[in-house]
Curated annotation (Swiss-Prot):
CDD domains: GDC-P. Disulfide bonds: none annotated. Belongs to the GcvP family. The glycine cleavage system is composed of four proteins: P, T, L and H. One of its GO terms (cellular component) is glycine cleavage complex. It comes from Yersinia pestis. This is Glycine dehydrogenase (decarboxylating).
Amino acid sequence: MTQNLSQLEHNDAFIQRHIGSSVEQQQQMLAAVGASSLSTLIQQIVPADIQLPGPPPVGEAATEHQALAELKGIASQNQCYKSYIGMGYSPVLTPPVILRNMLENPGWYTAYTPYQPEVSQGRLEALLNFQQLTQDLTGLDLASASLLDEATAAAESMALAKRASKLKDANRFFVADDVHPQTLDVVLTRAETFGFDVIVDRAEKVLELDGIFGVLLQQVGTTGELHDYSALLAELKKRKIITSVAADIMALVLLTAPGAQGADVVFGSAQRFGVPMGYGGPHAAFFACRDEFKRSMPGRIIGVSRDAAGNTALRMAMQTREQHIRREKANSNICTSQVLLANIASLYAVYHGPQGLQRIAGRIHRMTDILAAGLQHAGLTLRFKHWFDTLTVEVKDKAAVLARALSFGINLRTDIHGAVGITLNETTSREDIQTLFALFVGDNHGLDIDQLDAAVSQHSQSIQDSMLRRDPILTHPVFNRYHSETEMMRYMHRLERKDLALNQAMIPLGSCTMKLNAAAEMIPITWPEFAELHPFCPPEQAAGYQQMIGQLSQWLVQLTGYDAVCMQPNSGAQGEYAGLLAIRRYHESRNQANRHICLIPSSAHGTNPASAQMAGMSVVVVACDKQGNIDLHDLRQKAEHAGDELSCIMVTYPSTHGVYEETIREVCQIVHQFGGQVYLDGANMNAQVGITTPGYIGADVSHLNLHKTFCIPHGGGGPGMGPIGVKAHLAPFVPGHSVVQIDGMTTQQGAVSAAPFGSASILPISWMYIRMMGADGLKQASQVAILNANYIATRLKNAYPVLYTGHDGRVAHECILDIRPLKEATGISEMDIAKRLIDFGFHAPTMSFPVAGTLMVEPTESESKVELDRFIDAMLAIRAEIEKVAQGEWPLEDNPLVNAPHTQAELVGEWTHPYSRELAVFPVAGVLENKYWPTVKRLDDVYGDRNLFCSCVPISDYE
C-alpha cells in the first residue's frame, strides 16, 4: 500500500466528479494549447493586476456524503407546522409520478431555454399545455409560458397597462386594498422607477378618481373575500381603463373566469398545481391577456408553427419582443422564466384532468364551508360571507388563539387586525378540521363533520351564484387521456425523448454555463424540511433555512469581494434590476437624483439596457474597439459628457466577447472619477471564481447567476436565481420585504420578488456545490473551464476564425467562432451549422450573439476531453461538408447543412438528395452509439409569426 489515509480520503472528493477531465487529459489539452500548467495558463490570460493574492476563505471541500449529512442537520432545524397562512402559498400534494419523472429527472431539469426548437419539442408541448390551461381558466385569448412569480406578474400587468393604454396623459395606477401585501410591495417598487402614482383603496373607489390608466383587482382577496367584479369591470371598460385581475389558480376551477367578466389581464401563481411552497419558491406565475395586447405581453409565448416538411412543430413565438433583440425598447427585461415549475403545473393538470381538478377544488371549498359552519355554530364571527378557501375569523384574545395554535403545531395568518386567517388546501383532512375546531372552540366542541357537510351541501351560499363557473374547462384531449400512472409515465417519457439535455450531450452555449448539476446537489430540494415551509412562517420555525442562507451568503461575499449579498432576486435579469435600483436609491440618498445615465458597452447582454430602462435610467452606448474591448477614449468622453448625470456603467467581465479586458480597472476608475457606480454583470463569473472577484476589480455591485456559475440547473428555461452582491455603501439600498424582516439587512426598500429570499428552496443546490468544491476546487473549476475554451479555440481556429482573443491570442472561458467569411464564400450560415450539429447529437452554441453571423462556444469544466473532442470532430466534419458545397460537389440548395436536421421519418421516406442517408444521420462513427433523433425538421419561423397560434393543437398532430 503506497497511499496514506489522507490520500485515500482525497480520492473520494467531489471535485474529481464535477470536473470532467482527468489530470492526464488536462495535461494533454495544456500541451495542445502550449501551456505547461493550469496556473501558467491563467497567468498568461488573466491580467496580473486583478489576480487574487490568495484563495477565497470558503473552507475545504467536503465529500458528497459529508455535505449531505451536514446539510441534513441544518435542515432538521426547520419545523414543518401545519400551514394555514395562505397569502398566495399553500401546501400541495405533488403526484409522485411527476416528482420522480420530472422534478428529479435530469432529462427535464438540465435542458436549456428552447431557443433551438428542433431539440425542444417535448418541453415546448408541456408549456403549450400550460398556456392552454391558463387560457381555459382565465377566459382570455393569449397566455405566456410563465413569469417569475405572482407579484412580478402584477408589476408586469401594470407596465402592460401603461404601454397599451389609450389614455396617454393618465399616470395613476389603482390597486384594490385587498391584494396580497407582497404583490403591492413589488408593484410599488416598479411604479417608483416608472414614475407612476399608485392609489390603494377599496375597489369601488376607483370610479371616483381621474387620471387612471390601469386597475389591479384580486378576485379572492388576500383575507378571503370572494368578489364579483363584473359590474365594475364593465364600467372601467367604458372608461378605457385597462383592468388586471389577480386570481387563485385552484379557485378558477370553480369560479367564473375573470376574462369572461371583462378583465383585460389575468395572472396569478400556479404553485397550487403540484409545486411545494419551498419557503417562497421557485413557483411559476401564469399570465394571460386579450389578443389586442399580444405585442405588449411580457415573457415568452409558445406558438404552433410548422417545420420544413410542413408538419406541425412548436417554437417560441414573437421573439422580436424579447430583451436580447429590443434591448432598452423591450417590453420587459425578463430572460429566465419558470419553465420547470410551469411544466410541473401543466402536468399536474394533465394527470388530474378537469374532473380531478374539480374534485380537488370542490373538496377544498367544501372543507372551508364545513369549517365556517362549525365556527359560526360555536358562536364565532366570520368577517366575510363569500369565500373559496380562506376564512377571516374575528377573535377577542388574538394572542391567546395564536399561542394555542402554535401549541397545536399550526400556523395561522397573524397580520389581520382583530382576527386571524385560515386558508385550507388540498392536504387538509377531516382530522385537520377537527383539530381546528378544537383550537377555536375547545376539545369538547361537539361538532360533527358529517352533519355539517350535509347542511352546507344543501344550503351553501359562500360562492355567489353569479361567480360559479358554468363553462367546461380543459376539453382538449391531452387533459383527458393520461390519468393512470402508467399512461402518465409514458407520456412524460415521450416528451422527454424529444429533447436534448445534459444527460445526452454537452450543451456548448456561450454565456450560459451549462455545467453539471450533480445529483448530490439536487437531492436536498425535495426534503420536506426545505420543501414544505411557508415563506411567512414564524422565523424560529425556519432556523435551518436562516443558517443555510446565512452561510451561502457569506461564501458568496467571500467569492465576490463584496460586503453583503441580497438573495431576493429570482433571476439574473431581476438581479440586474435590483442592483440598478440600489444604485439609483444611493444617488437619491445623496441628493443626486439627477444621476440617471447608464453607460452600456455595445457588446452587452440585451438584459442590461432593458433592466436600465426598467430602473428609470437613460441608456448611452459605449463603443468597443476592433479587438472587442471597451473603447476607453469613447468611455471617458461619454462619462465626461454625462457629468453629474452619470449614474453607472454596466459591464460584463470577462467581456461578452470572451476575453479578459486588460483595462477593466481603468474602466472602473473612469466611471468613479465622474461620480458613477460600476455594475459588473455576473453572467461570466465562472471565469472569475477563485481567480479574481468583482470587488477586487473595483466594481460596486453585481448579480450572480446561481443557475450558471453555482450549479442550479436551467430547468429548460428556469428556475434561476440572481442574488446581488454589493459594497457596503449600497447595502442599505438592496430590496427589503413588507411582510418578513430580513436578518442582517437594515434596508427599508421595496421588494422585487414576492418572497423575501426569492426561490429559497433551490439555494441548497449552490450551498452543496460550494461546500463540496471548497476554495481549491472552485478555483480549479474556473481554470479548467478556461482551459477547455482555449483547447476548442486552438483546435478549431484554422477551420473557423476565432473572432476575439486577448493580447496573447488566448480566450477566456468561451470563444466566438466567426462564420461570416464562410457565409460570404459559400452561402452556408451559422444557422445551417447550428442545425447540422443536431445530426451529430449536439445542442448548438449561441448564435449571432454578441456578434451577428457568429457562434459563441462555452465548454464548462464539467465536460471531459472525450466530449470536447467529439464536439471538435463534429465541427471539423461540418467544415469539410461546407468545403464540398464550396467546391460544387453539393448544390447550395440541397446539402446536409441546409437540410439539417434530419428526422427518422425523412430517413425512411423517398430520398432524392445528392448525399447518402447514412451521411445525413450518422455523419461520423461516434454518433451511432448514442444517436439523438430530432422529431421535427427545421422550423419555419416566418410562418409561425405570421400565423400566431398559441393553444393546444389537435392530438392527431402529435401522433
